[in-house]
């Protein structure tokens, strides 16, 4: 039997014994055989708890650090996402448009290129809207927090929050409509985000017809 035990912090959907799930971004299909937290067996994992899950259908060498167990298919990994990016006041240098940085979110990490959407530079202590283009798809969702480090020397220079994990395209820089959209999306709950995306899709369809 192919099985493997994985650990991590539960964030959203609640795994239940026997659930079918997917390990992302690898795409491996698995079944939850057992759940534990702090040595205690569970039938349902609760959000915020550090959980160990025994998965049937995958072996150790098929799962990498930083991957996510997803129940219900609600998450899709993407190499491009929209963020609110802040540079630490004590950072030794600013972050410039097209800089490459080391990106960390929970246990996921990769190299990412920064696309600044407002100005060409974020000085220490400042923030702005940006896109991050990762070297591999990242299993992220709205509200995930992250940090960035310089590639060399490796030191933390900033961080932020994911606003849209699936923008689908690179935004035009310094576009007022894009900046307003990101501000609205950052303040909306999940239902509000869905309505905003429906409105955006309707507008794209209208533009295509015109």
Language-model features, listed with the residues they occupy:
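Single conserved hydrophobic/aromatic residue that forms the stacking wall/gate
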Residues: 1-12
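Short catalytic-site patches enriched in acidic/histidine residues
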Residues: 13, 35
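A generic "binding-loop/recognition-motif" signal
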Residues: 10, 28, 38
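Conserved hydrophobic positions within beta-strands
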Residues: 10, 20, 32, 114-116, ...
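Structural microfeature recognizing short secondary-structure transition sites
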Residues: 52-58
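Membrane-interface junctions of multi-pass transporters
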Residues: 47-51
